[in-house]
From Swiss-Prot:
Residues 25-52 form a propeptide. Disulfide bonds join C54-C67, C61-C72, C66-C79. Ion channel inhibitor. Its main location: secreted. Keywords: Disulfide bond, Ion channel impairing toxin, Knottin, Secreted, Signal, Toxin. This is U3-theraphotoxin-Hhn1g. Belongs to the neurotoxin 10 (Hwtx-1) family. 51 (Hntx-8) subfamily. Hntx-8 sub-subfamily. One of its GO terms (cellular component) is extracellular region. InterPro entries: Huwentoxin-1. The keyword Disulfide bond applies. The presence of a 'disulfide through disulfide knot' structurally defines this protein as a knottin. SUPFAM superfamilies: omega toxin-like. It comes from the Eukaryota.
């Protein structure tokens, strides 16, 4: 009888310990996505888009000239790929 009480106590203590470990792990995991997203979307000066002298694909070409390989569409006023009928 004593042996059964001891095994039940150890089982219960093990379950409580497992609950505490899982709770601590889950609380850390809740903070992890927030930290990850803030580091991904953090604005870094090295990765800011540089101003170009020319406009790239589907950029407005009113004031800027299109980069090489693109032409300014008279219809949409955007830089597009040249097509045979646009030449």
């Amino acid at each position: 009888m004593v042996n059964m009480k001891a095994s039940m106590f150890l089982t219960f203590a093990g379950l409580v310990l497992l609950f505490v470990v899982c709770f601590a792990s889950e609380s850390e995991e809740k903070e992890f996505p927030k930290e990850m997203l803030s580091s991904i979307f953090a604005v870094d000066n090295d990765f800011k888009q540089e101003e170009r002298d020319c406009a790239g694909y589907m950029r407005e070409c009113k004031e800027k000239l299109c980069c090489s390989g693109y032409v300014c569409s008279s219809r949409w006023k955007r830089c597009v790929l040249p097509a045979p009928w646009r030449r």
